[in-house]
Swiss-Prot record:
The Importin N-terminal domain, residue ranges: 35-103
Similarity annotation: Belongs to the importin beta family. Importin beta-2 subfamily.
One protein family per Pfam: IBN_N
Annotated localization: Cytoplasm; Nucleus, Nucleoplasm
Chain segments carrying region Disordered: 317-337
Gene Ontology process terms (BP): protein import into nucleus
Keyword set, alphabetical order: Cytoplasm, Nucleus, Protein transport, Repeat, Transport
Role according to the record: Functions in nuclear protein import as nuclear transport receptor. Serves as receptor for nuclear localization signals (NLS) in cargo substrates. Is thought to mediate docking of the importin/substrate complex to the nuclear pore complex (NPC) through binding to nucleoporin and the complex is subsequently translocated through the pore by an energy requiring, Ran-dependent mechanism. At the nucleoplasmic side of the NPC, Ran binds to the importin, the importin/substrate complex dissociates and importin is re-exported from the nucleus to the cytoplasm where GTP hydrolysis releases Ran.
Source organism per UniProt: Oryza sativa subsp. japonica
Superkingdom as given in the UniProt entry: Eukaryota
HEAT repeats: 14-40, 45-83, 92-125, 131-168, 178-208, 221-248, 260-287, 303-381, 389-420, 432-459, 477-510, 518-551, 559-597, 605-653, 664-695, 703-740, 748-784, 792-825, 834-866
SMART domains in the cross-refs: IBN_N
Protein name in UniProt: Transportin-1
C-alpha cells in the first residue's frame, strides 16, 4: 500500500483487495473468522484507514452495503488507533468525512455521522474546528440531505459527549452549544419530521447537564414542547414525553408553574395509539411520585388516570408473552429462553435483598408492566384513596366471563397484585373475600390468568401469614399453599414458573408454618423436578433452597431426605464440571447443607470434593483452557466457595476431617488473592467460616491469610469493593477470637484501616460499619496492650458504632474488648465516658453474666474515679432514657 501523503491516492490493487474482503464480510455464507484475520492483517498498514474512508466517501460504483461496512470498520479502527496514526493520515480521514455529511444515500449519511461522533470523542472541539464550520454550512443550506446529515452528526455527538459542546475553545467566538441551541429550537418548527425529531433529541440530551444555553432558552424550549405534543410524528411525540419525564426527574422546579398543563398532556399521551408514545408517557407517573412532588397536584387526575392505567395493563395483541404462554411442558427450552443469572457472592452480615417480583422479569419492559408499576406507585402515595375509583373497574372486568374478555380479567387480577402493599389498610378487612375469589382463578382455562393469579397471591403472602390466627386464617393459608402446589405441577411452562416463584415467596413469609406441610410440599416439588425443563428447574432449585432456609433443621428427617436428596444427587452426578446448570444446584445445596447441619454429613464427602475439583479445574482453565477442556468462568469458583461455606456452617467441626485431607487451604489462599472481587468476597467469607470451625488447618499459612485479608481493608480497596472489605473484616475478627495473640503482627495495620471506616460519614455500608466495630472489639480483647495506646483515635466513633449493633454474641465479643481497653488505660478513656455510657445503655439485655459484671465494674470504677459531682455532671449530659438503662449496672 502507498504511504500516507498530503495528496494521498489509493493503489488500485489494494483498493480491489479490500473491496473483495468487505463484500465477503457482508455475505452471510462467508468464513467470517478468516475474513476478520485478513482484515487484521491489512490493518497493520499505516494507511489502511485511508482506504476505508476513501471507500466510504468516494466509493461510487461500490455497493452501499460495502461502503457502510468500510465506515463501521473505520469507526472501530479510529477508536483503537487514531492517536498513533501518521498526522497526514489523521488529516486525510477528517477531510474526507466532511463532504459526506450530506451524502444522498441515507445509510451512508448515518454511517458518516457515527464515524464523526467517534472521531470527535477523540479529538474534541479544539482538534477539529473544521467540523463545526462544515456543520454550520450544512445547517444553513436548504438541502434536506445536508441538514439531516448535519443534525444526525450533532445528535450523535450530543448523545455520546454532550458536555464537550459546552466548553470554551480558542479560535471560536462562542461555545458550540451556544451557537447550535437557537438553530435546534428553530428546527422544532421545521416541516420535516426528521429534523424536528433530531433537534428535539439533541436538546433532550442536555436536560441533565443543563448548560446555560438551554437554561436561558427554557421558556422557548417548554413552549416548543407544548407545540409538539400533538405532532403527527410518533417519534416526535415520544421525545416530547421523554423530555417531560426527564425534566420532572432532574428539574422539577422548572415544571412546577406548568404542572397542571403538563399532567393533562401526559394523560392524553398515555392513551396514544402508538404504544411507544404511551409507554414513555406512562413513565411520568412514577417519576412524579419519586421526586416527591406535592401529591395533591395529581389527585384531581386520578379518576381519569386510573382507568387509563388499568386499560393499558391488558396484554396487547402483539405482546411476545402471548406466544410464549401457549408453550406447554412438551416444548423443549431454547437457549434464548434461559434468563441471564447472577449469583450473589456470600456476604457476612447482610440482609438478603428481595427478589424482583415482576411477573415476567425476563421480557422487555412494556406498556403493560409500566402501567402496573405506575399503579403500584400511586397506591403507595395515595393509599386507600384510589380504591373508590379502582375497585368498581376491577369488579367490572372480573365480571366479564366470556372468553373474549380474558385479557381484561387478567389485567384486573394484575391490578389487585399491584396495589397489595399500598392499599393494604383498606384491603386487609376484605382479604378473605379477595383470596376466596382468586383461588378458583388458579384453575382458569387461560394460562396467563393462572400465572398472574399465582403472582398476585404471592404479593399478599405476608398478610396471609399474619392472618393465620384469625378465624378461618389457617384454612385460607392451606388453600393457598395447596393451590400454588397444584399449579407448580401445571402443564404450561409459564404457569410453572409463576407458581414456583410465588411459592418461594410464600415460603419466605411462612417459615416454620410450613413444617406441618413438609411432606406434601416436597412431594410436589420433586414431582415437578422430574418434569421441569432447564429454565424452570432453576426456579425450582430456588424454591427448594428457600424451603430449606425457611424450615431449617426440621428438614433433617429421614422421611423427608428420602424424598428430595436422591433426585438431587442423581442430577449432581449427571452434570459435567463445565455445565452452567450446576450453578443453581450448587446454590440449592448451600441452603440444604446449612439447614440439615450435621444431617448433611452423609452427603458431605462427594459434595466437598466436587467443590474442590470445580475450583481447581477453573484455575486450570484460566491459564490453559485447552487442557481444562472448558473456558474459564469465575462463577463456578464463587458458587463452589459459597457451598463450602454452607458446609462449614452446617457441619461445624464435622468438616475438619474433609479439610485436613484436602488442598483447600492452599486453594483458598489463592482465591483470596484473585483479581475478581466476587471471588475474593466468597473466599474471605469461607476463611471466616473455617476460622470458626477448624482454625488449626489454616495455621501453616496463617500470616499469609492475615496479610491478604488486611490488605482488603486499605481505603482504596474499601472504595473499590466494599463487600470484599466487609468479609475480610469479619474474617479477621473470627481469626482473632480463635488464634489470640498470634494475630498481633497485623493488629496495628488492621486498626489503622478500621478507624477511618468507623469515622466515615453516614452512608457507608452498614454491614461494614458493624463488622468493623465488632472486629476492632475482638482485636482489643485479644491484644489490649497493643491497641490501648491508640484508643483516643477511635473510642468515640467506635462507641457510636457499637450502639447500632443488635444484641448477640458478636456484640458480646466487642464489649469484652471495650472493657479490656478501659481496664488497660482507664484515664485514657475518661474523655469518652459519655460515649461509653451510651454504648453500654444500647443493650436490651447482656445474657453473659461475666460480661455484665465487667460492664458493672467499668462503670462503677468511673463513678468512684470521678466522685459524685463529676459522675452527676456526666449523667446530666445524657438522655434520661440512657441514664435509666445504666441503672441496670448498679450506677
Amino acid at each position: 500500500m502507498a504511504a500516507a501523503a498530503a495528496l494521498w491516492q489509493p493503489q488500485e490493487e489494494g483498493l480491489r483487495e479490500i473491496c473483495t474482503l468487505l463484500d465477503a464480510h457482508i455475505s452471510p455464507n462467508s468464513d467470517q473468522a478468516r475474513i476478520w484475520q485478513q482484515l487484521q492483517h491489512y490493518s497493520q498498514f499505516p494507511d489502511f484507514n485511508n482506504y476505508l474512508v476513501f471507500l466510504l466517501a468516494r466509493g461510487e460504483g461500490k455497493s452501499f452495503e460495502a461502503r457502510q461496512a468500510a465506515g463501521l470498520l473505520l469507526k472501530n479502527n479510529l477508536r483503537a488507533t487514531f492517536s498513533s496514526m501518521p498526522p497526514a493520515s489523521q488529516q486525510y480521514v477528517k477531510s474526507e468525512l466532511l463532504p459526506c455529511i450530506g451524502a444522498t444515500n441515507k445509510a451512508i449519511r448515518s454511517t458518516v455521522g457515527t464515524v464523526i461522533s467517534v472521531l470527535f470523542q477523540i479529538v474534541r472541539v479544539a482538534g477539529w474546528i473544521e467540523l463545526f464550520q462544515a456543520l454550520h454550512q450544512c445547517l444553513d443550506s436548504n438541502d434536506l440531505d445536508h441538514m439531516e446529515g448535519a443534525m444526525d452528526a450533532i445528535y450523535k455527538i450530543c448523545e455520546d459527549v454532550p458536555e464537550e459542546l459546552d466548553v470554551d475553545v480558542p479560535g471560536l467566538p462562542e461555545r458550540p452549544i451556544n451557537v447550535f441551541m437557537p438553530r435546534l429550537l428553530q428546527f422544532f418548527q421545521s416541516t420535516h419530521a426528521i429534523l424536528r425529531k433530531l433537534a428535539l433529541g439533541c436538546i433532550n440530551q442536555y436536560i441533565v447537564v443543563m448548560p446555560a444555553a438551554l437554561y436561558m432558552s427554557m421558556d422557548q424550549y417548554l413552549q416548543g414542547l407544548f407545540n409538539l405534543a400533538k405532532d403527527p410524528s410518533a417519534d416526535v411525540r415520544k421525545l416530547v414525553c421523554s423530555a417531560w419525564v426527564q425534566l420532572i426527574e432532574v428539574r422539577p422546579s422548572i415544571l412546577e408553574p406548568h404542572l397542571k398543563n403538563v399532567t393533562e398532556l401526559m394523560l392524553q399521551a398515555n392513551k396514544d395509539s402508538d404504544d411507544e408514545v404511551a409507554l414513555e408517557a406512562c413513565e411520568f407517573w412514577s417519576a412524579y411520585c419519586d421526586v416527591s412532588m406535592p401529591p395533591e397536584g395529581l389527585r384531581e387526575f386520578l379518576p381519569r388516570l386510573i382507568p387509563t392505567l388499568l386499560s393499558n395493563m391488558s396484554y396487547s395483541d402483539d405482546d411476545e408473552s402471548l406466544a410464549d404462554a401457549e408453550e406447554d411442558e412438551s416444548f423443549p427450552d431454547r437457549d434464548q429462553d434461559l434468563k441471564p443469572r447472577f449469583h450473589a457472592s456470600r456476604l457476612h452480615g447482610s440482609e438478603t435483598g428481595e427478589d424482583d417480583d415482576d411477573d415476567d422479569a425476563v421480557n422487555v419492559w412494556n406498556l403493560r408492566k409500566c402501567s402496573a408499576a405506575g399503579l403500584d406507585v400511586l397506591s403507595n402515595v395515595f393509599g386507600d384513596d384510589i380504591l373508590p375509583t379502582l375497585m368498581p373497574l376491577i369488579q367490572q372486568n372480573l365480571a366479564r366471563t366470556d372468553d373474549d374478555a380474558w385479557k381484561e380479567r387478567e389485567a384486573a387480577v394484575l391490578s389487585i397484585g399491584a396495589i397489595a402493599e399500598g392499599c393494604i389498610t383498606g384491603l386487609y378487612p376484605h382479604l378473605p373475600q379477595i383470596v376466596a375469589f382468586l383461588i378458583p382463578l388458579l384453575d382458569d382455562k387461560f394460562p396467563l390468568i393462572r400465572s398472574i393469579t399465582c403472582w398476585t397471591l404471592s404479593r399478599y403472602s405476608k398478610f396471609i401469614v399474619q392472618s393465620l390466627e384469625h378465624p378461618n386464617g389457617r384454612e385460607q393459608f392451606d388453600k393457598i399453599l395447596l393451590g400454588l402446589l397444584r399449579r407448580v405441577l401445571d402443564t404450561n411452562k409459564r404457569v410453572q414458573e409463576a407458581a414456583c416463584s410465588a411459592f418461594a415467596t410464600l415460603e419466605e413469609e411462612a417459615a416454620e408454618e410450613l413444617v406441618p406441610h413438609l411432606g406434601i410440599i416436597l412431594q410436589h416439588l420433586m414431582c415437578a423436578y422430574g418434569k421441569y425443563q432447564r429454565r424452570n428447574l432453576r426456579i425450582l432449585y430456588d424454591a427448594l433452597g428457600t424451603l430449606a432456609d425457611a424450615v431449617g433443621a426440621e428438614l433433617n428427617q429421614a422421611k423427608y431426605l428420602d424424598i428430595f436428596m436422591p433426585p438431587l444427587i442423581t442430577k449432581w452426578q449427571q452434570l459435567a464440571n463445565s455445565d452452567k446448570d450446576l450453578f443453581p444446584l450448587l446454590e440449592c445445596f448451600t441452603s440444604i447443607a446449612q439447614a440439615l447441619g450435621p444431617g448433611f454429613s452423609q452427603f458431605a464427602e462427594p459434595v466437598f470434593q466436587r467443590c474442590i475439583n470445580l475450583i481447581q479445574s477453573q484455575h486450570l482453565a484460566k491459564v490453559d483452557p485447552a487442557a481444562a477442556g472448558a473456558l474459564y468462568d469465575k462463577e463456578f469458583i464463587v458458587c463452589a466457595l459459597d457451598l463450602l461455606s454452607g458446609l462449614a456452617e452446617g457441619l461445624g467441626a464435622g468438616i475438619e476431617s474433609l479439610v485436613s485431607q484436602s488442598s483447600l487451604r492452599d486453594i483458598l489462599l489463592q482465591c483470596c488473592m484473585d483479581e475478581a472481587a466476587d471471588v475474593r468476597q466468597s473466599a474471605l467469607a469461607l476463611l471466616g467460616d473455617l476460622s470458626r470451625v477448624c482454625p488449626i488447618h489454616l495455621h501453616p499459612r496463617l500470616q499469609e491469610f492475615l496479610n491478604v485479608a488486611a490488605k482488603q481493608l486499605n481505603p482504596q480497596c474499601v472504595k473499590e469493593a466494599v463487600s470484599v472489605a466487609n468479609n475480610a473484616c469479619w474474617a479477621i475478627g473470627e481469626l482473632a477470637i480463635k488464634i489470640g495473640k498470634e494475630i498481633s503482627p497485623v493488629v496495628i495495620t488492621v486498626v489503622s484501616c478500621l478507624v477511618p471506616i468507623l469515622k466515615s460519614p453516614e452512608g457507608l455500608n452498614k454491614s461494614l460499619l458493624e463488622n468493623s466495630a465488632i472486629t476492632l472489639g475482638r482485636l482489643c480483647w485479644v491484644c489490649p496492650d497493643i491497641v490501648a495506646p491508640h484508643m483516643d483515635h477511635f473510642m468515640q466513633a467506635w462507641c457510636n458504632a457499637l450502639c447500632m449493633i443488635r444484641d448477640d454474641f458478636e456484640k458480646e465479643d466487642a464489649f469484652h474488648g471495650l472493657c479490656a481497653m478501659v481496664a488497660a488505660n482507664p484515664t485514657g478513656a475518661v474523655g469518652s465516658l459519655t460515649f461509653i455510657c451510651q454504648a453500654c445503655a444500647s443493650w436490651n439485655e447482656i445474657k453473659s453474666e461475666g460480661l455484665h459484671n465487667e460492664v458493672c465494674q467499668i462503670l462503677n470504677g468511673y463513678k468512684q474515679m470521678l466522685g459524685s459531682g463529676g459522675w452527676e455532671q456526666c449523667m446530666s449530659t445524657l438522655e434520661p432514657a440512657v441514664v435509666q438503662r445504666l441503672g441496670r449496672y448498679g450506677v
